Amino acid sequence: DTSEFDPLANKEYTEEQKQTLEQEQKEFLSQTTTPALEADDGFIVTSASSAQSTPSMSALSGNISPDSQTSDPITKAVRETIIQPQKDNLIEQILKDLAALTDRDLAEQKRKEIEEEKEKDKTLSTFFGNPANREFIDKALENPELKKKLESIEIAGYKNVHNTFSAASGYPGGFKPVQWENHVSASDLRATVVKNDAGDELCTLNETTVKTKPFTLAKQDGTQVQISSYREIDFPIKLDKADGSMHLSMVALKADGTKPSKDKAVYFTAHYEEGPNGKPQLKEISSPKPLKFAGTGDDAIAYIEHGGEIYTLAVTRGKYKEMMKEVELNQGQSVDLSQAEDIIIGQGQSKEQPLITPQQTTSSSVEPPQYKQQVPPITPTNQPLQAETSQMPQSQQVNPNLLNTATALSGSMQDLLNYVNAGLTKEIDSNKQIDLIKEAAKAILNNEKSDIAEKQANIIALAENTVNNKNLKPDAKVAGVNAVLETIKNDQNTPDLEKSKMLEATVAIVLNSENLEPKQKQQMLEKAVDVGLSLKDDASRAAAIDGIKDVVIKSNLSPEDKGTMLIAVGDKVNVSELSNAEKQKLLGSVLKKKGVEAQVLSPAQQQLMQQHLYKITAEQTKKDTIKKVNDILFDPLSNTELKTTNIQAITSNVLDGPATAEVKGEIIQEITNTVAGSSLEAQDKAAIIKGVGETIATHSDTSLSLPNKALIMASAEKGIAESQTNLPDRELMTKGLVDGIYEGKGGPEITKAVSSGIDNSNINDSEKEALKKAKDAASEAALDRDTQNLTEGFKGQNIEEHKPHDDIYNKAREVINAVNPVIEALEKFKEPVVSAEERIVQETSSILNNISKLAVEKVNNFRAMLSPTGNLKTLEEKKEESIKKVDELVKAFGTKSSTEEQQSFIKTNLIDDKTLSKEVRLQTIDKLLQEQKRAEAIENPSVKTEDVRVVSGKSKLKPISKDNPDIEKAKMVVGRDRVNIKGNIKIMGALMNARDIIQSENLNKSTPIKRE
């Protein structure tokens, strides 16, 4: 009687109730997911097959027949290593939840029920099969810690089962990848013939790829995913051709119809066990996470949500219902599985045939394979390397010319490996061994009968065979694998993206091998990185390097060795010929995503990687900066003053950047070198260099220390000294740099740095001497100017205002002279009068009072300026305000639509408004003129005109031609291809007139200046 195990067998349930229970149990099944397992190529975790008598839908149900009734050892192994430990942990969590339940009577009732049943049946089949216990099971499965435990049990358990029952371990009919073969008449149809060990056909599986009009599926978080491609597999219901058992696991596809990576793959599995008549019977359906269908019809495709992504399964609603009915009829069971490739396991009564896997070789020289590699999902398809006979050539026949013949004669990839291993055993010369491996790789990649997937699988098999071969010395193994990698690189028929997958898989085999030392692994890794960096398109290079880095992180290496491997990857990227931008991207990924987040790189390794990244970033910054400088220098619409301002801004940005002082110095050196080598007049270049020097000297001491300023200033002079321009021009620019230092109030250390820059430059001694003289002359001239200014200060300017004692004396003398006649007249009349001395004292006292008031007013003004709320600003702040004010004026001008409004704006805001500095108004005019000229439109593409413009007011004045000797400014002819001026002539004229007025403003010091 099986009713106690099977709620669906209870005749009190209606058919609808049975279906409801069945769906609930399927959803219960979804609560546990099997994480991707570590695997070798073709390493697939298979399900348990059993002879139990109930079609329970839960992986934890325990409704498996007693051991005595189970003939399938795989089922027994799954029960003992996976299902029962999971049940034990689940019951433990349920008991914890019951202890916290507020309904103490119900809690005690369920606790006793569990204890009593456990004494009779440790699998607790009745408890798990009772729908009344559903809420307790669901609540327990919501516990995140329990989920982790169940997943860890699955990982360890399925790994154990695979190692025991894989074909590579010698288990008859062990697991192997499906060999799909394209249909001759239709590209969307594929098929594979499944045979038992005796070679008798069990069935033919047909796969159809469906290209459909995109439809939308919603995920649990509400986001939507479009599906445009999926596949259907015609799973057999009845099998009556041959005896044996069969287990099919078909990978669920991503939303775009492609296969996911191994660590994200989920499967739909059908288990066919040998029935009473020897023929396979469908006994189990293993479906991942809650199964849903994209519609209500029988043709609706099944899908699941796994890890936040939508995956389609290769079964429709109609096929699924048909299979479930057969499972119930055959009294099967369903369990959860998660594998990484479509696989088949077929069992029968005959001797196992050779499989197309790298592990099965008859050569005793190959060590047993290690099952620790994580290889990307590569499903071999179509037939293997075809053959007519499996006769193996003798070792003396091994040479590059005969290897292709051997491949053509090979009955399978295994035969090729046997052939290679025989040659490696007989051949002592390591060079010839490597040649043999190389030619084998060429034979695989050149085989026209293999598709890309099969070539990938066979190349990986060859690499693993090389790593595990005992007849190869360690250095020969390195050279052999590197030869395979080089062959991949040189192959012209394999797409780069597919090559990247081969590289990733090969590195996984190498790093996880127990037959290699870390040094040898690193050598192979570096070769793989070299090949990856040599791929032609950016996406393939990124895929290769990222894949290799992921393999390093997931490998079984120690954390220290992982860090060493990542550093090796970074070093290869750093010395490659890639652009700095691409290097930054790849190194940033190694440092942050792969190294730091995965906690693999040590602090010292992180620092080393960061240095690589800083260096590359500095090179890129240098290139970007020099491009900006060149754009400014060669802009014909900006004068020297504007060029200087813009290059000063660039210099300031460099000084404020995150780079080291040495890197900043290198960039500043490039700036001055670029300016010095430009085609501008020497005076213009000197003016720009002066601005650079002033910017460095005045930069904030808090962000740039004095020693660093000196270092950068030396670099600035070195850029001038080493420029490819004549010596007089370099002397003039050196003087300009020194003038800038004095303008910026730079100290003697900064000035001395100019000499250091000259000494360190790569020029001859005579040029160094000349530049030092120019520097000294500029310094002396600057000191003379300072001394003269100081002397003038002592002499006094505006004597009447600043020398009050002179004012008193002169005023007193005037008073005396005026009073004397009055005194004389009064004396004549003998009337009492005020004496002249008394009047002088009174007048003097009044003047002193006025002076005192003036002094107090001045002192109060200074106090206000120096107070925390005062408006005293640094040079940098003033520059920022100027730039901001210019932008505001330009923006305001842009709001004026008519010519009259624009002319009025120019007069009011630029000519008449003396509260604005000359610099702000002139810069505004220059910017407005540039915008007027840049607003030119193409009227007649076929017409070319010329425009004569003033290069710079500071340019050296030369006659433009013999016919026009009186022109007073240097001019150049600017060719303007296919452009015709449409600017507003009135506005341009008004702007240029305003510029002339402002430049000629009276600078007499007696003119009152309104202070803000």
Swiss-Prot record:
Residues 62-73, 348-373, 380-396 have a biased composition (Polar residues). One of its GO terms (cellular component) is cytoplasm. InterPro entries: Rickettsia_antigen_120kDa. Keywords: Cytoplasm. Residues 1-73, 348-396 are annotated as: Disordered. Residues 47-61 have a biased composition (Low complexity). Residues 12-27 have a biased composition (Basic and acidic residues). It is found in: Cytoplasm. This is Antigenic heat-stable 120 kDa protein.
